[in-house]
Each structure stands twice: as structure tokens, then as C-alpha cells.
Amino acid sequence: GPMGATGPAGTAGETGPTGPQGPSGPTGPQGRDGAPGSTGPVGATGPAGPTGPTGPTAAAVGCACVQQMRNVLQQLIQLYPNDNAVVAMDSGNNSSGRLGSLLPAGPNAGLLQLVNSQGVPQEAVSICRIASVRITSASYNNAITYLPVPVPPPTGCDADCEAAIRSYLPVGTTGVAINAGGQTVANGSIIRNEFGMVVVVGPNSSDPAFVSTCKAEIINQ
């Protein structure tokens, strides 16, 4: 006889076991950088470096004063060749005459040679012992230049005393009288105040006296 109709589907069977893991896919693109982390702790201090070379030795203030006096004398010889000068020494002795030359020639001169009105050499005086040089019957010449403070600057008690004198006598101070070696070596007003030297003048910048601030002893103002 004829085939009968297909019967209904049976119920689904149980899920089979998971198959084996497939191979890894290709690596994806790199993600964005994360935010910076916090700063780590400061490392330990490294060892000290080697000691540097010794710096230049400061000149003694007395030598620096002599250098300034020598510098000024070189200019006074050129600027006042026919004027009489009174040179006051730190001992209280005085010499006078025209300013002739510095001896020996060169940058290390230690003597000032005085000459008479005919240019004949008279006595020579030690630059190291000069308290002041006063040019009589002449006016201060603004062309005179001065050495700056040495580098490194002098130190010590002598340097303190020299600096104190300059501080005590600023430019414009009037009625000044400076004593050295038991005598007044300058009086008037302060027109220049430089390392190692003050310049004292009379009315209208007359009779300039170039005073070593290493030699000044008693100061009135």
C-alpha cells in the first residue's frame, strides 16, 4: 500500500562537548599612552667634585695704595712739569721741588725724583713712604685717572682702616684737615675719593693735595 506521512521531529539531543580552542588571532593596534606616573624620589647626592685651583692672592692694601700713588705721580709729572710740589712723608719730613721722574723707569718704580727749576735732580723720595703730594699754585686737573679697586680686593685690618677713611670722606666733604706724621698734610674739600687716595683742594679746586688713605692718621671735618 502507499507510504505513510512523515512522523513529527524528535526532541533535540544534548549539546555536544566544546571543540578545541582555535588559533590566536593577529595582535591588535597599540593602545594610547597612559598618563605619566608620579615623580620618583630624589636620588642620593653624588660625591663632591675635586677642589678647584687656588684663586689669585689679594694684594696687601699697603701695596695697593703705593700702586695708586705711583699711578697718580706718573700723571702729575706730565700735567704739572713746571709747578712746585710739596711731598709730605709719613715720618713728618717734607721735600719740595718739581716732579721729575719715577725711578727706576718702568712699572715697578719705587722712587720719586725731584728736580729744581732748571731740571737738575735733587733728592729722591720713597713712594712707599709718601703721605701726600700737594701741587702749589695750580688747580686740580680733571684729566687725572685712577686705578679701580684691585681684584680680588685687599682684606684684613689694614684694608678695613683704609676703607673706613674713604667712607668717612665722601666727595663734597668740606672743612677737612688730614694729619700724618705729626703734621697737617692737606686741608680743604674732598674733590675725589678713590681706592687708596683722596684728593683735597682749596677754593676753586686750587692747591690739590693727593693723600694716601693708607697714611692718613688724624682726620678733622
Question: Positions of the model-derived regions?
Answer:
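Collagen/collagen-like triple-helix sequence repeat recognition
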Residues: 1-64
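Conserved RNA-binding domains used in RNP assembly and mRNA/RNA metabolism
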Residues: 56-221
